[in-house]
Amino acid sequence: MIKTYPHNIFKILAAIILLGVIAAGYISWQRYNVEAHATTVEMVYDYNNILESASVESTSADELFSLYKRSGITSLAVYDETPKKLADHGYIAVYHGSELISHMSNPLIRGNRIYIASTNTSEGIEYFDELKGQLKRLLRKDDFHIIHLNNEELLEINANYERFLNMPLGIFKTTVKKVEQTGLYIVLRPMNVPHATREDIDQFFSVVDSSGKISAILFQGKEALGYPAQLEYLLGGLKERHLPVVLIEAQNQLGFERQDGTLTLSNKDGYNTVRLYAMSKDELIKLDPKEAASRFYVSTIERNVRMNLFPSYKFAANGETLSETNARYIHDVTNRLEKHGFNIGKASVMEPYFPSRILRAASIAGAASLCVVAILLIVPFLVKYAWPIEVIVFLFTQTLYWTGYEAILRQALALGCAVGTPVIVMSLFMDYCVQKKQSAFKNIGWGHLFIEAVLLLWGCGILSLIGAIYISGILSDIRFFLEMNIFRGVKLTFILPLICVSLIYIQRFPFFGKVVVTDKDFIGFVKKFCQIDIKLGVLALISLLGIIGFIFIGRSGNNGAPVPSFEISLRRFLEDIMYARPREKEFLFGHPAILASLAALYHRWPQILHYFLVIAITIGQGSMVETFAHMRSPFILSLIRGIDGLVAGTAVMIIVLAGLIILTHITEFFRERYEKE
């Protein structure tokens, strides 16, 4: 217990922790300002999708551009052209040689060749001329010829017909100019060229320079354009034009989809990067428009996403056209983001933030002291060695920090704070329970119990949030904001506090008639615990704990157990009424357990029940702290999420209070009836 510390060492540890919190808090304030200045979200839709929809929806492309603008779309994604795309849009005509021979007899036509002609419209002529230049660059001289037939220019290609139709031709300037006329921004999606040369990169930048509306580069496929040989050359052009590279969030929300070269470009370009959320069409069709909108909304506010790439549904709904169905769910996302305080426009690029090394060092010193306090609470006999332990830990961590081992040190201390904070908070709570253990419920009453529980909840919650600031202060930099680096040990932050609090609990409260003070006591406790008779009720309780454990641990992370539909509905409701949706294990489970644990204490219910309730509280406090380990989530959102959880937990306490009153009256009724008999 803290009260058993030598007075001087406790004062010194408390002072170091306080100074560290101030430094970590200042770093977190700087982080908040960086995040607060990057609140513009770019909403992107596929340009070709609009053209294809216009051709089958009895409307014009201009009308659909207007529809999507009103829904919130700010930008159109432009991809590499292919011969098939150009032919489908009516810009060129593609013939197999054998097909052309059947219509005309000319010795110049060969049956094993492909022939391309312009459609003789103004757009067709432009596309044909640009296609001619692209094919000349991409094909061997022997495989590409220009011939004239009946005063008409034809392109003769020696290639497999089917494969040629889908051959990437690069992004066309003509397409970029057409998109520019819509007034929307343009997101270019180039594919890599096999054995790319500087000429290929120059060709791409000539397309970029043809418009002033290019907002970002979002590579298509598994490699960045120019990877690997021309990546440095591409980087120079991107820097010169101040164009951000877009990184696509991975489907499991950890890191990014593999695109070789993109992280290198981002690192070397000073993190001039935008984080993008994209949902596959296969995933979209499983969701109704409201749920799809919620996915995009949540990804933006919770994961520093500043660009959304919207897919199209396969089928229309509610008697609308497909475009209207798509525009409706996009409009829903736009409305919710604007209500949350975001702007819609060209994507914000976060400042490449790295805090002062002096501030970071102070945060590390405080975090190390916090970990020392947690260790002393778990292993009390080490208290007499507190001075040397603190000095050794301080010197060791500072040496690592200043000698180039910063990365692993920061990860270790962040994990230590995520585990140590709930351990310290729960130790204080258990000390309070020990002091109140002899109080009888008849001297307190339900009203007093509720007020006491609320005050304890908020006291514990505030202490947990203060400890959580250490995680933010230690990890804060642009690499963590963008999730190029991630916090390691999420599962441990759930499990270790439970183990540590259990060890402290048996030193505070008597299991099997006595508290654990010495190592012999602990061995005796383990032996008695292993000799407990397993009854049906105990087996049922263990099974229940197993289910709770599956939910608690299995649902953590990004690939956890499935979430039932009723819980999804609850989540969406909370997202609508709160700035940040709190976690269910906090406000439905951990926070109300404070009230139940006090009731168990004052009513002198079985010790095992009080223990499980303390474990439940630990889960709630640990969850509050662990929230801050998700560094891609804005600092203010994590902070308000914790506060919202305390508010919701207080409300749920009222329901728990009513349930406890009813349960107590029922048990008293049957007890009195049994005694009379």
Named regions from a protein language model:
Residues V34-R357:
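Soluble extramembrane regions of membrane proteins in the secretory/endomembrane system
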